[in-house]
Amino acid sequence: LARRWLILLLIPLYLYNLGSPGLVGPDEPRYASIGREMAASHDFITPRLDHQPWFEKPPLLYWMVALGRAVHLPDEWAARVPVALLSLAFLLFFLETLAAEFPVRVALAATAILATSAGWVAYSSVAVTDLPMAALFTAAMLIAMFDTRRDTGYIAGALLGLAILAKAFVPLVLFLPVFLISRGKRLTMIAGCLVVAVPWHALVWIRNGAPFWQDYFWKQQVARFFTPSLEHVQPFWYYVPVILAGLFPWTPLAGLFARRKTYDDVRVRFLVAWMIYALVFFSAARNKLPGYVLPLLPALAIVLAFGLDRTGVKRKWWLMASGLMLVALPAIAAGLPEALLAGLRRAPHVFLPGIPFVIVAGAAWWLAWRERSTLALAAVFGGAVIGLFYLKAKTYPALNERVSVRQFWRDHESDAANTCVADSVRREWRYGLNYYAARVLPPCSGPGQVEITEQSGKLELVTK
């Protein structure tokens, strides 16, 4: 019970200011719009964007958004709270599962690393499909690996089915190595997966026919992997810096992969082999986005926690290095908003907010030096939590102003009846404008209209 306090400490961090920035990027407004339409129409089979079928993703996230709206949460909260709560529930499961399989100190360290890594926290705060898929897939993977009871195969399979409903067929590819080592549970896992994943796919295919498979499977799965048509092409090595950045502030622990003792346990060796397999798979794809490799972070946290536990007296150096990373948080928090608003060359140098993090880093350093490794780990964890609070408080207003269209639309909503959108407006802002307008804003076609245009990276309203 005492170890669950770790999760209780995370609840305020994960729910803090979720509604502060408006919906951002092209994905959040689209997914929130589809969930809103599902809640209004009570059609939970065919996803619709602006009343037209939309087969880019399966429905789990849309169902979650619809549930948020059903309990009358505001727009951004309805979209993001279900994802944050799923992340917290997974972290509790992660902690308890590892505590039953490894020493409790390893379970606590792995959960602390994952729960405060920048990548996991970031994707727990936005309404996109990456976090639900990563959490559900990892839960299926851990049950398949660590629970020897044959009937738990149904649970692992059902969770894998939910992961498929979160992000289509990628979880099947990732699960293949786990399936191959789970000899006693293969049939039960297949049964559990089919029971959960097949009904929606069958119903949406019956209702929509060939257009569903053409878009959902051939375009979004096959073409996304093999062709550059979706315009997210990146080099083969792209995910190495993405993963290292996603680990912040625990990035220095990646050096533990160079230590032989990290591989003392067969379970860890399998996880490392699985991560290599998954990394090669994602790297081979033509289209790459940072969130694709989110499923690697839980396994990575386990390996790093185990490796840290095997470092002995040298553990202090690894914790000291992670503690020092906290010093960068104020610079990130101070520089990121200005970078978003005015460009990197005008980002300010602000030193005073860094003092508390220097103190925390110094405390972690001192505790590690005194061989108080558990307290040093707790100091880094606590500093990361405080730093992430600080980062959210400092950056969310800038995200709302610079990346979301919510404030712009609220300021000009009185002109909505005659508003049109110029061709110059980028697609992510179009989706956001359509979401907050609750309709598709038409393209500009003649005089007498109030035109939304983009000038120097900002939206402006012009009367023609």
Language model regions located:
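Membrane-integral, polyisoprenol-dependent glycosyltransferases
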Residues: 1-315
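Membrane-embedded architecture of ER/inner-membrane glycosylation machinery
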Residues: 150, 154, 259-464
